[in-house]
């Protein structure tokens, strides 16, 4: 009896076939008059275009706020927003902060108590050689005759 192999391509049926970035919009604000916006103005004139070409699924807005320090404000699909003050930062560090905003998920930082998360935690806990204190190990020495 011979088995025939039918060549097929697996097609995702649950909607997981595409990746959507959690960050949907990034807003850059600066002031024309203030000296704290010098790095932001340099970033907007040199590096913003390359960042926008890299991430075409994110919407970029540039606003002028007179008398205010420059900000990066990121809006996420979860409804949260992250605000980073870029006062007196260089253009390269503002670029790194913009990439950080673009790549983060927008969730609140949370404390991870255990390195492994499980849906069914162990009844006895995780075994460790130091946890068995009831029976300490003994070192046996050979007695010489």
UniProtKB/Swiss-Prot annotation:
InterPro entries: Ribosomal_mL43 (IPR039927), Ribosomal_mL43/mS25/NADH_DH (IPR007741), Thioredoxin-like_sf (IPR036249). GO terms for biological process: mitochondrial translation. GO terms for cellular component: mitochondrial large ribosomal subunit; mitochondrion. Keywords: Mitochondrion, Ribonucleoprotein, Ribosomal protein. Gene3D superfamilies: Glutaredoxin (3.40.30.10). GO terms for molecular function: structural constituent of ribosome. It is found in: Mitochondrion. Belongs to the mitochondrion-specific ribosomal protein mL43 family. Component of the mitochondrial ribosome (mitoribosome), a dedicated translation machinery responsible for the synthesis of mitochondrial genome-encoded proteins, including at least some of the essential transmembrane subunits of the mitochondrial respiratory chain. The mitoribosomes are attached to the mitochondrial inner membrane and translation products are cotranslationally integrated into the membrane. Also has an extraribosomal function, being essential for mitochondrial genome integrity. May interact with MHR1 to take part in the mtDNA repair mechanism. PANTHER family: 39S RIBOSOMAL PROTEIN L43, LARGE RIBOSOMAL SUBUNIT PROTEIN ML43. This is Large ribosomal subunit protein mL43. The lineage of its organism: Eukaryota, Fungi, Dikarya, Ascomycota, Taphrinomycotina.
